Amino acid sequence: MMITSAVVLYLLLLSHQTVSEEQVQQFVIGEKGNNTTLHCLDHPVNASSVLYQWKKDGAVVATQNPPNPSVHLSISENGFLRISGLQLIDEGLYECESQAKGGRSWQTLSKIQLTIAAGPTGVSLDISPATFLNNGTLFVHKGSNVNFSCSSESNPSQNLTWTVDNLASDNPEREFGSKSPLAFSITNIQPLDQGTYTCTSQNTLSRRTANKTQELLVYYAPERHPECSWELGDKPSDVLFICSWFGGYPVPTLTWQEVEGAAEGPTINLTTSQQTEELNVSVNRSILHDGDKVKCTGHHVTGVEKSCSFTLKIPYPTGQPLATALEGTNITISCTETSSLPPAKTVWKKNDDLIENTSKYIVQENRPALTLTIVNVTKADEGVYYCYSENPLGARELEVYLNVKTSAGNGGAIVGIFVSVLVMMIGIVVGVTVYTKRDRICIGLRFSQLDDDRVDVLSLVDSDEEEIFHEAVPRLPPVTNGHATTLVEIHRIPSCDHEDIADSTEQSDQTRANLTEAGPQRAELQPAV
């Protein structure tokens, strides 16, 4: 930066120089608005014997003892030129000339190049889009794109620099340049980008600096909704409503209020507001009613507004109202309470006595269920047990009656079960028997339904038994082939059709004749049964 300034200064001096560099004996830099004195370097030892005058760019601008003295330009007794309130027009090549009193010629004693430095002035910065707070601080929304711009006036030239002072940056410089305005931008700005931003302008000739600072904050609302909760207060008669909304900057404003009250009873009068991340309100339970609805609203300065709410509900435990246990066994009864707000405290009682964990009773809480196990049940354990639930709105209980049966009382049940199994087994055996002999049963039923009418039945009997009927049945004529004949038994079976008797006789005779011709068997007539 120093090298650049030196080069600019050198070029500037060249542009304003009217004589060669060898002729200039001194370079003087003055600041606009200040006073400066130019020395006449080679003035005589006896200054009182000479007269002085000063020229600027070849023109006389000041003389000693003028008739109308100038406040802006004046010459001292020793020939020094004093310039008050430097202006840009005062810049140029000044020559100090002297003349002996009574003389007629002027002698140039020294040549001085005066350069006027102005500024920097009018340093201004702009950060947008941003919003001013009452204290002058700017804030932007997290994730937005922010533009930074800085400008100033300076003669002959200037250097501009953007810096930021925050804890997240090791290098404070953000941007540097000689052009005005000097601008840069931050895309998707984050909380780490907040800090104090400074724009510094430095005159390249006088090294004079000027700056302007602006504190910038990055605001963001919590991403989640507020959370509403509750707990018992320090006093037994109080309940504490808790509203929390963490994760934003700056902290939000939280407000508790009653949205919808119960049909009867006084209102909660809960309206309370405070700028905090957690707002706790203590309410006396006497003014709380079933059905009251309360709401917590969180408002953030960025314009984000979110809320949470809940409706107060009295407890309502549920479960089976009847339980049966066998004497000498263990029994577990349970109840469930899920509807209460704030959540109720649930316990087991018997005869208004609180049941706690002992060798006889085992109480287990597996939300939302609360179980009671009675070990080694006896007849004395029979009775009513209460599942008692209570919250700030009130209390309710579920009655569970335990019926205990003794071992003697179960004898009849065991006998009944045995008889039932026996009857079932007999039925299975009878069914299987009937199924396996179904053909015989069906034939017997068929013959029992016939009338006294008769029909002829032809039965074939093995010829090996012919000796038995040899005397009782007339023998048929022998066959020439020498084989045994088949014995034919003809039975008379009742028939309802009397007209078919003659036909049956003819058919029998025909059958006998056919069998006689058959060969190796014989036909024998046997009286019908």
From Swiss-Prot:
Record keywords: Disulfide bond, Glycoprotein, Immunoglobulin domain, Membrane, Repeat, Signal, Transmembrane, Transmembrane helix
PROSITE patterns: IG_LIKE
All residue ranges annotated as the Ig-like C2-type domain in the record: 19-110, 129-217, 317-403
Cross-referenced SMART domains: IG (SM00409), IGc2 (SM00408)
Bilayer-crossing regions: 412-432
Disulphide-bridged cysteine pairs: C40-C96, C150-C199, C335-C387
Protein topology in the membrane: Single-pass type I membrane protein
Glycosylation sites (chain numbering): N34, N35, N46, N135, N147, N159, N211, N269, N280, N284, N330, N357, N376
Signal peptide: 1-18
Main location: membrane
Spans within the Extracellular topological domain: 21-411
Record's GO cellular component terms: membrane; neuron projection
Presence of the UniProt keyword Transmembrane helix in the record: yes
Protein name, UniProt field: V-set and immunoglobulin domain-containing protein 10
